[in-house]
Structures are given as C-alpha cells and as structure tokens.
C-alpha cells in the first residue's frame, strides 16, 4: 500500500438528499481504493467538501464550510478538495477565491476524484456537468434504517429560476437493472424505507426507454424482500401518468405520499417561471383518484412580478386542502438564472412577509388534517429511543412523513422500542409539525 492508501478521508455533504447520496457513493469509491473512512475531522488526513449552489443560501453555506475547513488546514497537515455544484458553477474562479484548496471536481467528474487525490491528475478537474450513475457500492450515512435512491441525474426542464441544467447537465436515467441490484443490496443490509429522488423523479426512463416508466420501476422495487416502505419525492407535475397513479393504488409498499413541487398556483407566476400552467388541475386529478394520499409541495414566495393577487390565488388554492405539507422559500435571485433578468422584482421584506403568510395558511391546514385523525391508530418507523429517567423518549416517522422535513412521531413510553422496527400508536396532538402519540 502507498501512503495515500493508508490515509483517512472525511466527506462533508452539503445541501439536499441528492448530495447525500453522491457523498455516499464517493465514500464507497474511496473505501474500495483502500482509504480509511471517518466522520471525525480531527482524524482526517483528507477532507472532501461536496457542495451545493442551487440557491444563494446554499452557495453561501458551501463557501462558509470551505473557509472553516481551510482554517483547520492552517493548524494541521490536511489536504482539502471541493466537489459538486460550486466548482461546476464557478469553474476557474474557485482557484482564485480559494487558492489553498488542493483540487476541484465538478459534478461530471466525481468518480475521478480519487485519481485527483492520488496525484494522477493535478490541479483543477472541471469537466462537463453530470453525476455519478450506475454505481452500487455506497457507504451509508446516518439515514439508516432509511436510504435514498437517486434514479436519475440532471434535468430537462427550463424553469426560469433554476440553474440545475447548467450544474447537472441533461436528464439521464439510470437503468432499471442497476437500480434493482442496488436496492436489493440495500434491503439485504437492513434498509426498511427506500426514498426515490432525482431532480425530476417522474421523468424517469423517457431518455433511455422512450416513455415515462417510473410506474414499472416501482413495481419491480416493490417485489424486493425486506423493504417496508417506498417513498417518492421530487415528482414533476406534468410527468405524473395515469399508470403511476394506478401503481400507488395497487402496491401497499408504496407509501400513500407524494412530494410534488408546484412552486406556485397563479398562472401569471407559473408562466414567468416556465412551469406547467395546468399544475392545479393535475393536483386535483391526483386527489380525486387517490383521495387518501398525503401530498407535500414546495412554493416560491416573492418571484419577480408576483402580485398580492397572485399570492391570494395561491393561498386560496392551498386552502382547498390538497397538501398536508409545504416548504415555502423566498425567491433566490441568481444572476445565472433567466429570472434574474425579469422586471418588477419583489422587495425582500415583502417576499419574507408573503412567505410567512403562506406558511401560516398551510400550518392551519396541517392542524385541521391531524385533528381529523386524533385517536386513530398509525404505524411508524422507530428512528431513535433514548432513556430519560424512567421513561423512554422515542422518535420516528409515519408513512406520511419524509425525513427532516415533515416533523416526527413523538412517543413517551415505559418500555424501549427497537430502532429500525415498526410500532403502532394512537394520535394525541401536534407540537409544531411533530405528532405526539400514545400506546
């Protein structure tokens, strides 16, 4: 073994679950090359910072993290590499902003990062955008007993506020065979919940199979032994097919839950965003065919040209009660995005005020929905169990809650529960977006 192989590496993943999965693949690649893996920065000889730059806040977080690690580098022998969206966005500017970084890898070169660390290639390593695909070996992170499955890379849409196509390239689906093999390995390792992700999950397969075939993929995955739940995030409204809706009806392993980012409900704003104008109608159709499904969405407040009338139209649509959860974000103006050139930008203070209005409206809807199931029995996945005095404080999630964004199930119990197991309890009350239960 060379000195490089004996060294310890830590990978820091910033941003969304898609970056988490890529970091897991990176760790797998490094481990196969003989590196020791550690989450302890004090023990690391090499640190890889896997960055996000989708919005201003993500870009700022990435830059702050880089500076923090570079401060550590001043005090110890440490090599630092930056990968992902920030190098893809800034390219050669990275070496000017951060001259002490040892190397950079854009989104299309992640699989070659170990070569850069080994010194086979020196300096910047920026190539066309893309991402890791068809790789089965991962070092799973703290998401156990749940795991994300990235089914595609890139994006084929032209949303005016988004720079993902420039950062991630065109839409590329992974093959069904590679996904089935990976999920079988995940299930064998003890994973109970599988969460499908991509920039657009419902666009899956069109590029390689000639049609949207997410429904067929879900059927294959639902046959894998060991899995209890299969969850779908990042569904693009206009790609949701009748076949997909039927699969949700027929297969119990598929959670009756779907994340569909609509971004807005006003046609004026949707048009400026270059999003599907028939989005409200699509949501109505889904709820008509799947009345019990729990829907989550994402909304942008303060988009250029948005008026108070548009906001009222959005809130009126939300008040129909189609969504149980909504992530609301103030518009982030990136100079690289088409929307930055639009007229009538909304003042930051007004955007913040609108965000709060939308959040309050949605929370009232959430409370009303939970009130309707008080004292009903629900099943949840146990994620932690800590003893506090004579009581066990237990946290988990139901089939209608995604990790980190939809709150938790909270149970105080006199007996411990097994992490990774499932338990049934009755709904008592809400605390924020957490749901308190009792046995």
Curated annotation (Swiss-Prot):
First-level EC class: transferase
One family name in Pfam for this protein: TRAM_2
GO annotation terms (biological process): tRNA modification
Molecular function in Gene Ontology: 4 iron, 4 sulfur cluster binding; aspartic acid methylthiotransferase activity; metal ion binding; protein methylthiotransferase activity
UniProt xrefs under InterPro entries: Elp3/MiaA/NifB-like_rSAM (IPR006638), Methylthiotransferase (IPR005839), Methylthiotransferase_CS (IPR020612), Methylthiotransferase_N (IPR013848), Methylthiotransferase_N_sf (IPR038135), NA-bd_OB-fold (IPR012340), Ribosomal_uS12_MeSTrfase_RimO (IPR005840), rSAM (IPR007197)
CDD domains, per the entry: Radical_SAM
EC number: 2.8.4.4
Co-factor: note: Binds 2 [4Fe-4S] clusters. One cluster is coordinated with 3 cysteines and an exchangeable S-adenosyl-L-methionine.
SMART domains, A to Z: Elp3 (SM00729)
Protein family according to the UniProt entry: Belongs to the methylthiotransferase family. RimO subfamily.
PANTHER family per record: RIBOSOMAL PROTEIN S12 METHYLTHIOTRANSFERASE RIMO (PTHR43837), RIBOSOMAL PROTEIN US12 METHYLTHIOTRANSFERASE RIMO (PTHR43837:SF1)
Functional summary from the UniProt entry: Catalyzes the methylthiolation of an aspartic acid residue of ribosomal protein uS12.
Annotated HAMAP family: MTTase_RimO
Identification of the protein by name: Ribosomal protein uS12 methylthiotransferase RimO
Taxonomic classification: Bacteria, Pseudomonadati, Elusimicrobiota, Endomicrobiia, Endomicrobiales
